[in-house]
Amino acid sequence: MFSNWNIFLNYKNFTINQEIKNKLNLYYQILIEENQKYNLTRITELNEVFEKHFLDSLLFVEQFQIIDQKIADIGTGAGFPGIVLKIFFPNIKLTLIESNNKKVNFLKYLVQKLNLNDVEILNKRAEELNEYKEQFDIVISRAVAYLNIILELGVQLVKVNGMFILLKGPKAYQEIKDLKNKDQKMNLKLINIQELEDTGFGTRINLFYKKINHTNNLYPRKYQQILKESK
């Protein structure tokens, strides 16, 4: 059982109570029990999971308030950051997007065990979700792909005036440079950069893009085409 709850008290815009603590402990227990079956994470030590996965999933909330928005998490894997957000902000409407079948099975089991409501799990690739075009207030992704790839994969899902939030590491500035204004072509505007330095989880650079107009029908292209251009 985790006990160092003080690590969650140094940040604004989210609070922690006993119900949240219980769910996070259960989340950890399920994650470790199922990890060998599903290959979910290389980080398994208790304190590391709570800091490098759970807390790291929340750091962007310092800069952007979460209340009851409709949120899509692209490439959620073991549920980071989406499930963590749902535990702390139960009023959000959450869609988890994951193309790996085994991880989808884990997510379904996890959502059931945590007794989470208003969670949709899609076993698809983000660029294939044409029926979800401009449906989400927030699209978020944590360490899934290079910036010029992930922006194109997910841009169609974001509402006009909605946010595309990317949880990144120390290479984020180089990735921004490599975009070569591709974000502007997709009607995305970088409105905020959050920099965090901590010995526990290293350098974190979170990017906040606002969608300022509808997505051009050119985007997203087929994944292999996006990938080929990015090389």
Swiss-Prot record:
Its main location: cytoplasm. GO terms for molecular function: rRNA (guanine-N7-)-methyltransferase activity. It comes from the Bacteria. S-adenosyl-L-methionine binds at G75, F80, A126, E127, R142. Pfam families: GidB. It is found in: Cytoplasm. The keyword Cell division does not apply. Its EC number is 2.1.1.-. One of its GO terms (cellular component) is cytosol. Disulfide bonds: none annotated. The keyword Transmembrane helix does not apply. Keywords: Cytoplasm, Methyltransferase, rRNA processing, S-adenosyl-L-methionine, Transferase. Specifically methylates the N7 position of a guanine in 16S rRNA. Belongs to the methyltransferase superfamily. RNA methyltransferase RsmG family. This is Ribosomal RNA small subunit methyltransferase G. It comes from Mycoplasma capricolum subsp. capricolum (strain California kid / ATCC 27343 / NCTC 10154).
